[in-house]
DNA sequence: ACTAAAGAACTC
DNA sequence: AGTTCTTTAGTG
């Protein structure tokens, strides 16, 4: 019998294994990689075939009689290639998650199908006692009238019973009065456009026949000029040609109205404003020469391109992409945030106008699907986007570029908690592709790996045209306070703003906190108002609401303190909203635009804000760290960083690294075109090496000092970290389970070097929705051994434990 | 995640 | 006893 091993697309750890199905004769063409529709339990779900095998009854053993047949195929071709399956399997093993959970990342949307339940009446039960009730009778009669309807359709037909329809339907199914059927439909919608196709040759004689039908004559002329005599209705409409005219001409048999699929692409009309750089610098050439042999021979290798801001890393990316495309291989270009795709698309479009698709999670499902279709048809070979672009179905990747490789947003912070760098590296290995990590300030991990010889370091230390780096000035905020300035804005920064505006130039100001006030406290009893779900302080926003930046929950500001009923409630700390207000007061003539998560909810909000700023409609761009990333605005000559060190006091071993990178990156935004920029950094820790090295743009200096600390504390890159989060309603159970694991770990690794386990300790959000959370941290030099140990302990199958490999937040 | 079956609580 | 709500096991 022909059988298939199938992983069902259900994200539950306890069923993270293959189930065997029989393959009916009419589906005998199915192979590994196909998405299918299968019966599972009492319902039908999507599944992924991972292998197909001919099996005898003996081989099947006692399962022989229990096999259910695969119902249908979801697509017309296999969705997962062998390489994709291989990558998904490796990643599932590495991150200790289920294969299905990993595989569903390789599709746009979590599932390829939408399953609807269709209810049908059972005729034999027409006189069931339960149907004496009017509501039940109405539903039954409604279904008896026609074919069978979904819940939504019944609700539409019987609006009176809509509210308790679910209960009615459940009940009727329970008694067998109604039957259920599961129907799978495509989730995404293909879009079509109508177009006119010219059938005849347009000769002067033919046009003469339409002397008295001017509109149709015009249409003929337009179509004869068009490519292949085809033109979309939308384009014709733009030329004031009505559908009536088109239909008339179709009646006459001279044209044909047809339909074709259009692939949506909201980046299609990106204007080509980028000037191609013609002469490469010496450094650029060196970098390209180092990588080219590997690309030409189709050999995997990893490179770290360390180039200061303005050294022309993008041009290196483009040159390498050209070479990969010339060999017929595909290219993936990753950026840390969706907002930065526009920038890269712009640069690449100048060289590859039609060879690009954009892929990220803010696109609609259909749009992502259209992008996949374009890639599959060979309509584009360069995928640009955020993390999720890595999972585009590509069969021949030659080059993976990861810009700003140090950026923490490359780590997915929900399950499966993968790091794009790990995925990129594994894909590069499987495809024998070149991996190119780019950064001005590489992560300590990557830089360390170049010293270990695992990656090849390429450097570009000079800015193009040898432009000077900006002048950086540090302002000690303690000093400011002593001088009597209690504003967020120091006087030197205020002065810089005024001077810059006087010259007609622009300023970027970065404050790493959104909202108005960072916490709200009662002055009588000291109670800080906290989120009901996670107990973290709520942030006050100017719209009068308190919001939790962790759970995205908002609530109104209470009139009196919830603890002591005092009316003395005050706002402390400052965010971007408050700074915006203060700027208006201190520099009334300044036109300020704010960019943070609150003002960038829509797909193109980032681009719109930056565009307005670029067009000089505003003087000051004020925002959170997103203003520090990758934008190049010529007229910006000054940058202010409000509290560069706010992260230094966090309980995170990467605090110093974060602070250093924030300063270097933000400072890099100033003065990229001719004029030397000026940067002011406000800090309470002017002596800290992260601040001093940041100001001096001294990566090596920072690296050396930080590495000493990391080694002393056995932190990455000298170890790798695995975070385990234990959750339980009972505090003691959560803690006890964690404790048990710690004991088992110590037993297992007794005497082994390079293994350390810490905890359990309460998580930052110690209690979430009534569930207690404890954290255990493992530091190891032998990650595979730890992964193996966790698998032995069956930890990856437990619903109450979340495993995070290479976590970003420790607690 | 969802279903179906088994068990516990509740109504009459 | 009959019904309804809750818990639990199992999905090929």
Question: Across the structure, where does each feature detected by a protein language model lie?
Answer:
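Generic solvent-exposed, charged/amphipathic alpha-helical segments
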Residues: 89-92, 155, 494, 580, ...
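Short proline/glycine- and acidic-rich turn/helix-capping motifs at secondary-structure junctions
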Residues: 759-769, 802-811
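Short amphipathic alpha-helix segments
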Residues: 735-758
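Inter-lobe coupling/hinge segments of SF2-like helicase ATPases
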Residues: 275-281, 285, 289, 298-735, ...
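Short, flexible, solvent-exposed loop/turn segments with mixed acidic/basic and small polar residues
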Residues: 141, 712-716, 763-769
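C-terminal effector/interaction modules appended to NTPase cores
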Residues: 769-771, 790
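Short amphipathic beta-strand starts and helix->beta connectors
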Residues: 702-711, 750-764
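Accessory, non-ATPase domains that flank or precede helicase/AAA+ motor cores in DNA-metabolism machines
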Residues: 1-383, 388-439, 451-467, 748, ...
């Amino acid at each position: 019998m022909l059988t298939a091993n199938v992983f069902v697309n259900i994200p539950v750890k306890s069923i993270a294994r293959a189930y065997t199905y029989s393959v009916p004769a009419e589906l005998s063409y199915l192979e590994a990689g196909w998405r299918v529709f299968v019966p599972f339990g009492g319902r039908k779900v999507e599944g992924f075939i991972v292998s197909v095998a001919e099996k005898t009854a003996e081989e099947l053993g006692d399962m022989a009689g229990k096999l259910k047949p695969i119902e249908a195929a979801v697509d017309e071709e296999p969705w997962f290639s062998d390489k994709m399956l291989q990558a998904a399997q490796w990643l599932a093993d590495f991150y200790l998650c289920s294969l299905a959970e990993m595989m569903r990342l390789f599709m746009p949307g979590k599932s390829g199908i939408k399953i609807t339940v269709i209810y049908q009446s059972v005729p034999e039960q027409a006189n069931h006692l339960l149907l004496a009730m009017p509501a039940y009778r109405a539903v039954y009669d409604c279904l008896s009238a026609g074919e069978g309807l979904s819940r939504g359709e019944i609700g539409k037909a019987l609006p009176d019973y809509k509210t308790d329809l679910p209960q009615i339907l459940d009940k009727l199914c329970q008694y067998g009065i109604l039957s259920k059927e599961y129907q799978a439909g495509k989730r995404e919608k293909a879009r079509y456009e109508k177009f006119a196709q010219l059938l005849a040759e347009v000769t002067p004689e033919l046009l003469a026949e339409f002397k008295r039908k001017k509109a149709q004559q015009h249409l003929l002329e337009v179509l004869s000029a068009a490519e292949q005599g085809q033109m979309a209705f939308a384009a014709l409409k733009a030329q004031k040609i009505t559908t009536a005219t088109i239909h008339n001409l179709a009646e006459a048999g001279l044209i044909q109205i047809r339909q074709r699929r259009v692939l949506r692409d909201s980046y299609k009309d990106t204007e080509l404003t980028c000037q191609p750089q013609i002469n490469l610098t010496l450094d650029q050439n060196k970098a390209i020469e180092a990588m080219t042999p590997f690309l030409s021979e189709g050999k995997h290798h990893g490179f770290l391109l360390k180039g200061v801001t303005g050294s022309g890393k993008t041009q290196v990316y483009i040159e390498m992409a050209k070479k990969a495309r010339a060999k017929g291989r595909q290219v993936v270009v990753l950026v840390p945030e969706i907002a930065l795709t526009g920038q890269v698309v712009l640069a690449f479009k100048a060289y590859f106008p039609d060879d690009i698709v954009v892929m990220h999670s803010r696109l609609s499902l259909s749009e992502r699907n259209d992008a996949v279709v374009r890639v599959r048809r060979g309509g584009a070979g360069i995928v640009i986007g955020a993390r999720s672009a890595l999972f585009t179905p590509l069969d021949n990747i030659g080059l993976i570029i990861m810009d700003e490789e140090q950026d923490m947003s490359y780590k997915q912070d929900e399950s499966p908690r993968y790091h794009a760098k790990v995925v990129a590296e594994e894909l590069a290995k499987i495809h024998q592709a070149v991996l190119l990590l780019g950064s001005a300030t590489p992560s300590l991990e990557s830089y360390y790996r170049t010293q270990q010889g695992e990656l090849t370091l390429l450097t570009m230390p000079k800015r193009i045209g040898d432009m000077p780096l900006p002048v950086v000035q540090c302002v000690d905020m303690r000093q400011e306070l002593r001088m009597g300035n209690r504003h967020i804005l120091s006087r030197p920064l205020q002065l810089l703003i005024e001077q810059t505006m006087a010259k007609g130039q622009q300023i970027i100001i970065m404050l790493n906190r959104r909202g108005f006030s960072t916490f709200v406290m009662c002055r009588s009893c000291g109670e800080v108002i906290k989120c009901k779900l996670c107990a973290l302080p709520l942030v006050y926003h100017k719209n009068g609401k308190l919001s939790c930046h962790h759970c995205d929950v908002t609530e109104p500001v209470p009139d009196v303190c919830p603890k002591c009923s005092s009316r003395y409630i005050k706002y402390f700390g400052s965010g971007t909203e408050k700074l915006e207000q203060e700027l208006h007061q201190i520099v009334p003539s300044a036109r300020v635009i704010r960019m943070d998560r609150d003002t960038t909810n829509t797909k193109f909000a980032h681009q719109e804000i930056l565009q307005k700023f670029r067009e000089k409609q505003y003087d000051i761009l004020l925002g959170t760290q997103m203003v520090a990333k990758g934008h190049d605005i010529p007229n910006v000559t000054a940058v202010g960083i409000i509290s560069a060190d706010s992260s230094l006091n966090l309980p995170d071993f990467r605090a110093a690294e974060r602070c250093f990178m924030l300063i270097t990156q933000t400072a890099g935004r100033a003065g990229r075109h001719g004029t030397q920029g000026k940067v002011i950094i406000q800090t309470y820790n002017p002596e800290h090496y992260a601040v001093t090295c940041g100001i001096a743009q001294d990566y090596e200096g920072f690296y050396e000092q930080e590495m000493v600390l990391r080694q002393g504390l056995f932190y990455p890159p000298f170890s790798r970290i695995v975070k385990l989060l234990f959750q339980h309603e009972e505090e003691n159970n959560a803690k006890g389970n964690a404790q048990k694991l710690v004991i088992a770990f110590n037993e297992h690794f007794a005497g082994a070097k390079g293994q350390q386990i810490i905890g359990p300790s309460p998580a930052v959000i110690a209690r979430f929705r009534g569930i207690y959370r404890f954290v255990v941290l493992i530091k190891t030099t032998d990650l595979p051994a730890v992964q193996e140990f966790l698998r032995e302990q069956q930890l990856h199958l437990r619903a109450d434990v979340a495993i995070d490999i290479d976590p970003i937040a420790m607690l």
